[in-house]
Amino acid sequence: MQAEIIFTGTELLVGEVLNSHAQYLGRRLTEMGIEVIQHTTVGDYWGRMGLVLLQALERADLIFITGGLGPTIDDLTKETVAEVLELDMKLDEASLEAIREHFAKRGMEMPDNNTKQAYFPEGARVLPNTRGTAPGAIVEVDKKAIIILPGPPWEMETMFDNSVVSYLNSLPHRGTLCTSKTFRLTGIGESTVQELIDDLCGMGNPEISFLVNPGVVEVRVTGQGATLEQATGLVQNLSEQVRKRLFQYIFAEDDEKIEQVVGQMLIDAGLTIAVAESCTGGLIEARLSDIPGASRYLVGGVVAYTKQVKERILGVPADTLAQFGAVSRQTAIAMAEGVRRELGSSIGLAVTGVAGPTSSEGKPVGLVYIALSSPTGVCYREYRFPGERKAIRSGTVNAALKMAKHFLQGK
């Protein structure tokens, strides 16, 4: 079964808005064994939209259309579908009442133009929108289906999960099913990653692919099978081999948030953490504090950008700074011990490094030291992060959280 996705909205064409729908729908449909054969982005003009829809109907079994379901005159998706299929637009009373209730819950009266959102091509299956005022729809024609979804990502994704998945699962002959496992790595470049697992690549099914973001290399293992169990088995077998070879660089898997994992591990262990940061400027503490309830384990942090702050606030000995420099193993350890002592936490985590764009004290750009202090002792690691300033800082944050995770795991 093949699908085509049409993204509507002039804001997408001119680059004002990032098209996150492409990634989400492409991934979800592929996982369900539906082959996505084409993406098309079209502006808010019904003539072009109609032409694109006609072409898609010739190629694909399923046509997904996102956006253009609002109450304004340039929201033309449903009207275009009706025009192309020569269908009348009909008012859905249940949708109209749901839209009225949406406004009433906010102490507002529904504007008259929102009535437009309750009209659908005749015979359409209405998809309720639990997070907005724009219901979606499924229109079936000649053994094909046009699936109309709202533009805002949070509305579209919720509607897909709540209504579209069950519809797609009811369709026969979806083809092979697909699943994947993703590993997120830091402190290593893409080429080195490939060298370490080169003999595992090129199998075809399952296959390994790579994606590089600032400070992160993603390794994805993807498998296909006649059943989800078969595909999952293929992925699990290869993933275990990948995990063993790359363990020291893996900081997260799939959609896992390492800061959330570390936080829960601290809670389970009854421990607290404090952070001393130089080159990351508070990014580690920000990641940890982004999780609700972080006050249960995060004591606080110190941004020690200068030698003076490292010495006065964290108690880094002046002779350590003079002999080894601000970017050194010795300074990182002293920072970790100092922040644990001064803030009274169970664990002290510290980073110091050269984020660039120029070297410092003769130390190269990308050189970073990370240290962790606990009642049982200290551990540290030296990194040479590739890339620009943003990538180095991002990699440092992930590596520091990985060190905390491995410590809490006892590894």
UniProtKB/Swiss-Prot annotation:
Alphabetical list of Pfam families matching this protein: CinA (PF02464), CinA_KH (PF18146), MoCF_biosynth (PF00994)
InterPro entries: CinA, CinA-like_C, CinA_C, CinA_KH, Competence-induced_CinA, MoaB/Mog-like_dom_sf, MoaB/Mog_dom
TM region positions: none
Entry-linked SUPFAM superfamilies: CinA-like, Molybdenum cofactor biosynthesis proteins
Family: Belongs to the CinA family.
HAMAP family: CinA_B (MF_00226_B)
Name this polypeptide is given: Putative competence-damage inducible protein
Annotated gene: cinA
